[in-house]
Protein backbone atom coordinates (compact mmCIF):
# COMPACT_ATOMS: atom_id res chain seq x y z
CA UNK A 1 0.00 0.00 0.00
CA UNK A 2 1.43 3.45 -0.93
CA UNK A 3 2.53 5.62 1.94
CA UNK A 4 0.06 8.29 3.00
CA UNK A 5 2.00 11.52 3.47
CA UNK A 6 0.30 13.53 6.19
CA UNK A 7 2.21 16.80 5.93
CA UNK A 8 4.19 18.98 3.59
CA UNK A 9 5.71 21.84 5.61
CA UNK A 10 6.96 25.03 3.99
CA UNK A 11 9.63 26.77 6.08
CA UNK A 12 9.69 30.47 5.32
CA UNK A 13 12.86 31.99 3.97
CA UNK A 14 12.34 34.94 6.32
CA UNK A 15 13.48 32.64 9.15
CA UNK A 16 16.91 32.13 7.58
CA UNK A 17 18.69 34.49 9.96
CA UNK A 18 16.40 33.93 12.93
CA UNK A 19 17.88 32.64 16.18
CA UNK A 20 14.92 30.24 16.25
CA UNK A 21 15.87 28.53 12.98
CA UNK A 22 17.82 25.65 14.63
CA UNK A 23 14.88 25.08 16.98
CA UNK A 24 12.49 24.83 14.03
CA UNK A 25 14.80 22.38 12.28
CA UNK A 26 15.13 20.14 15.32
CA UNK A 27 11.35 20.17 15.70
CA UNK A 28 10.86 19.29 12.02
CA UNK A 29 13.31 16.41 12.34
CA UNK A 30 11.16 14.87 15.08
CA UNK A 31 8.29 13.87 12.74
CA UNK A 32 8.45 12.44 9.21
CA UNK A 33 7.43 15.40 7.06
CA UNK A 34 8.50 16.87 3.74
CA UNK A 35 10.09 20.28 4.27
CA UNK A 36 9.90 22.83 1.46
CA UNK A 37 12.54 25.56 1.86
CA UNK A 38 11.74 29.14 1.02
CA UNK A 39 13.99 31.17 -1.24
CA UNK A 40 15.47 33.16 1.62
CA UNK A 41 18.33 35.58 1.09
CA UNK A 42 19.43 33.48 -1.90
CA UNK A 43 16.25 34.41 -3.80
CA UNK A 44 16.64 38.01 -2.65
CA UNK A 45 20.00 38.04 -4.43
CA UNK A 46 18.27 36.90 -7.63
CA UNK A 47 15.77 39.77 -7.36
CA UNK A 48 18.57 42.29 -6.91
CA UNK A 49 20.50 40.91 -9.89
CA UNK A 50 17.42 40.94 -12.13
CA UNK A 51 16.58 44.50 -11.14
CA UNK A 52 20.13 45.54 -12.02
CA UNK A 53 20.56 43.62 -15.27
CA UNK A 54 16.98 43.20 -16.45
CA UNK A 55 17.29 39.57 -17.52
CA UNK A 56 14.18 37.54 -18.39
CA UNK A 57 11.65 36.31 -15.86
CA UNK A 58 12.20 32.75 -17.12
CA UNK A 59 15.84 32.90 -16.04
CA UNK A 60 15.00 34.61 -12.75
CA UNK A 61 12.39 31.94 -12.03
CA UNK A 62 14.89 29.12 -12.60
CA UNK A 63 17.49 30.90 -10.48
CA UNK A 64 14.95 31.44 -7.67
CA UNK A 65 14.18 27.72 -7.64
CA UNK A 66 17.91 27.06 -7.39
CA UNK A 67 17.90 29.50 -4.46
CA UNK A 68 15.33 27.31 -2.72
CA UNK A 69 17.63 24.35 -3.25
CA UNK A 70 20.55 26.29 -1.76
CA UNK A 71 18.49 27.20 1.30
CA UNK A 72 17.54 23.53 1.58
CA UNK A 73 21.21 22.57 1.59
CA UNK A 74 21.82 25.11 4.33
CA UNK A 75 18.98 23.69 6.42
CA UNK A 76 20.36 20.17 6.12
CA UNK A 77 23.81 21.44 7.02
CA UNK A 78 22.43 23.06 10.16
CA UNK A 79 20.46 19.94 11.09
CA UNK A 80 22.07 16.74 9.75
CA UNK A 81 19.11 14.72 11.08
CA UNK A 82 17.22 16.03 8.06
CA UNK A 83 17.71 14.23 4.74
CA UNK A 84 17.58 15.85 1.30
CA UNK A 85 15.90 14.64 -1.89
CA UNK A 86 14.80 16.18 -5.15
CA UNK A 87 11.97 14.02 -6.51
CA UNK A 88 8.67 12.70 -5.12
CA UNK A 89 9.80 9.06 -5.18
CA UNK A 90 12.95 9.75 -3.14
CA UNK A 91 11.05 11.97 -0.72
CA UNK A 92 8.47 9.23 -0.17
CA UNK A 93 11.15 6.60 0.42
CA UNK A 94 12.77 8.75 3.09
CA UNK A 95 9.45 9.22 4.86
CA UNK A 96 8.83 5.48 4.68
CA UNK A 97 12.06 5.10 6.65
CA UNK A 98 10.78 7.48 9.32
CA UNK A 99 12.95 10.43 8.26
CA UNK A 100 12.06 14.03 7.57
CA UNK A 101 13.16 15.12 4.12
CA UNK A 102 14.05 18.54 2.73
CA UNK A 103 12.99 19.02 -0.88
CA UNK A 104 15.66 20.27 -3.29
CA UNK A 105 13.60 21.49 -6.24
CA UNK A 106 14.81 21.38 -9.83
CA UNK A 107 13.25 23.84 -12.26
CA UNK A 108 13.77 21.42 -15.14
CA UNK A 109 11.66 18.77 -13.43
CA UNK A 110 8.63 21.02 -12.92
CA UNK A 111 7.14 21.15 -16.39
CA UNK A 112 3.65 22.26 -15.40
CA UNK A 113 1.88 25.11 -17.18
CA UNK A 114 0.38 26.26 -13.87
CA UNK A 115 3.87 27.12 -12.61
CA UNK A 116 4.42 30.47 -14.26
CA UNK A 117 7.89 31.91 -14.73
CA UNK A 118 7.07 34.91 -12.60
CA UNK A 119 7.64 36.35 -9.13
CA UNK A 120 3.91 35.73 -8.65
CA UNK A 121 4.93 32.10 -8.08
CA UNK A 122 7.13 31.66 -5.03
CA UNK A 123 7.96 28.82 -2.67
CA UNK A 124 4.45 28.95 -1.17
CA UNK A 125 2.89 27.97 -4.49
CA UNK A 126 5.62 25.41 -5.13
CA UNK A 127 4.93 23.87 -1.73
CA UNK A 128 1.26 23.57 -2.71
CA UNK A 129 2.26 22.03 -6.03
CA UNK A 130 4.55 19.49 -4.35
CA UNK A 131 1.84 18.60 -1.82
CA UNK A 132 -0.41 17.80 -4.77
CA UNK A 133 2.27 15.69 -6.47
CA UNK A 134 2.80 13.71 -3.27
CA UNK A 135 -0.88 13.40 -2.44
CA UNK A 136 -0.19 14.95 0.97
CA UNK A 137 -3.14 15.35 3.29
CA UNK A 138 -2.15 18.74 4.70
CA UNK A 139 0.07 21.72 3.96
CA UNK A 140 1.60 23.81 6.75
CA UNK A 141 3.14 27.22 6.10
CA UNK A 142 5.58 28.37 8.79
CA UNK A 143 5.77 32.17 8.74
CA UNK A 144 7.70 34.78 10.69
CA UNK A 145 4.46 36.76 11.15
CA UNK A 146 0.77 35.87 11.26
CA UNK A 147 -2.19 38.05 10.24
CA UNK A 148 -4.80 39.19 12.73
CA UNK A 149 -8.26 37.70 12.53
CA UNK A 150 -9.54 35.26 9.93
CA UNK A 151 -6.99 33.57 7.65
CA UNK A 152 -8.88 33.74 4.36
CA UNK A 153 -6.56 32.89 1.50
CA UNK A 154 -7.25 36.13 -0.39
CA UNK A 155 -6.43 38.15 2.70
CA UNK A 156 -3.11 36.34 2.92
CA UNK A 157 -2.36 37.36 -0.68
CA UNK A 158 -3.29 40.98 -0.01
CA UNK A 159 -1.07 41.10 3.08
CA UNK A 160 1.86 39.57 1.17
CA UNK A 161 2.01 36.42 3.30
CA UNK A 162 1.51 34.16 0.26
CA UNK A 163 2.11 34.78 -3.43
CA UNK A 164 -0.51 35.77 -5.99
CA UNK A 165 -0.76 32.38 -7.65
CA UNK A 166 -1.23 30.46 -4.41
CA UNK A 167 -5.06 30.71 -4.50
CA UNK A 168 -5.18 29.23 -8.01
CA UNK A 169 -2.80 26.38 -7.23
CA UNK A 170 -4.91 25.42 -4.22
CA UNK A 171 -8.37 26.13 -5.65
CA UNK A 172 -10.74 23.16 -5.44
CA UNK A 173 -8.32 21.04 -3.42
CA UNK A 174 -9.56 19.08 -0.42
CA UNK A 175 -6.12 19.45 1.16
CA UNK A 176 -6.13 21.34 4.44
CA UNK A 177 -3.87 24.39 4.66
CA UNK A 178 -2.61 25.63 8.02
CA UNK A 179 -0.42 28.45 9.32
CA UNK A 180 1.88 28.67 12.30
CA UNK A 181 4.14 31.47 13.36
CA UNK A 182 6.77 32.86 15.70
CA UNK A 183 7.71 30.78 18.70
CA UNK A 184 5.57 27.79 17.78
CA UNK A 185 8.47 25.41 17.22
CA UNK A 186 7.86 24.05 20.71
CA UNK A 187 4.30 23.14 19.69
CA UNK A 188 5.13 21.76 16.26
CA UNK A 189 5.04 18.05 17.03
CA UNK A 190 1.77 18.35 18.96
CA UNK A 191 0.37 20.61 16.24
CA UNK A 192 1.06 18.05 13.54
CA UNK A 193 -1.05 15.62 15.55
CA UNK A 194 -3.79 18.11 16.46
CA UNK A 195 -3.54 21.09 14.09
CA UNK A 196 -6.86 22.58 15.19
CA UNK A 197 -5.43 23.09 18.69
CA UNK A 198 -2.18 24.77 17.70
CA UNK A 199 -2.31 26.07 14.11
CA UNK A 200 -4.57 28.47 12.22
CA UNK A 201 -6.69 27.07 9.39
CA UNK A 202 -6.59 28.85 6.04
CA UNK A 203 -9.99 29.38 4.42
CA UNK A 204 -9.70 28.45 0.71
CA UNK A 205 -10.99 30.45 -2.26
CA UNK A 206 -14.05 28.24 -2.66
CA UNK A 207 -15.27 29.16 0.83
CA UNK A 208 -17.12 32.36 1.59
CA UNK A 209 -16.04 34.97 4.10
CA UNK A 210 -17.51 34.50 7.55
What are these regions (language model features)?
Residues 1-196, 206-209:
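Nucleotide/pyrophosphate-binding catalytic subdomain
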